[in-house]
Design a protein with these regions (language model features):
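Thiol-based oxidoreductase modules, predominantly thioredoxin-like and allied folds used
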Residues: 30-43
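Non-catalytic, surface beta->alpha helical segment in thiol-disulfide oxidoreductase systems
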Residues: 59-89
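Structural micro-motif
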Residues: 49-59
Length: 89
C-alpha cells in the first residue's frame, strides 16, 4: 500500500499547511510519515528522495519507489487522494 511522506522544517512558512494535509490524510486512513529535514534521520530520508526544499510531499509504494512528488508546494487533499487511488501499491 502506498504511503505519503511529508518533509518539513521549523522555519518553513508553508510547512504548517503541509502538516495539516498530513493530518487530514491520516484521518482518512492514509499512512503518513513526517520528516523534519533539520534532524539527521529526516535529512537522510530527504536525500533519498531528492528533496531540496520544503514543504515537499512524496507518495511512495511499499518498496519506497516514488509514485508522485510535490516539491516546494502542498497539493490539495483531493489531488493526493486521487493520486493514491490511481497509483499501484
Amino acid at each position: 500500500m502506498s504511503k505519503v511522506k511529508i518533509f518539513w522544517q521549523e522555519t518553513c512558512p508553508n510547512c504548517p499547511q503541509a502538516k495539516e494535509l498530513g493530518k487530514k490524510l491520516a484521518a482518512s486512513g492514509v499512512a503518513v510519515e513526517y520528516h523534519n529535514i533539520r534532524d539527521s534521520a529526516g535529512l537522510t530520508e530527504a536525500v533519498m528522495h531528492g528533496v531540496m526544499t520544503t514543504p515537499s510531499v512524496v507518495i511512495v509504494a511499499d518498496d519506497d519507489s516514488e509514485k508522485a512528488v510535490w516539491r516546494g508546494s502542498t497539493p490539495k487533499f483531493d489531488e493526493v487522494k486521487a493520486t493514491l487511488a490511481s497509483a499501484p501499491a
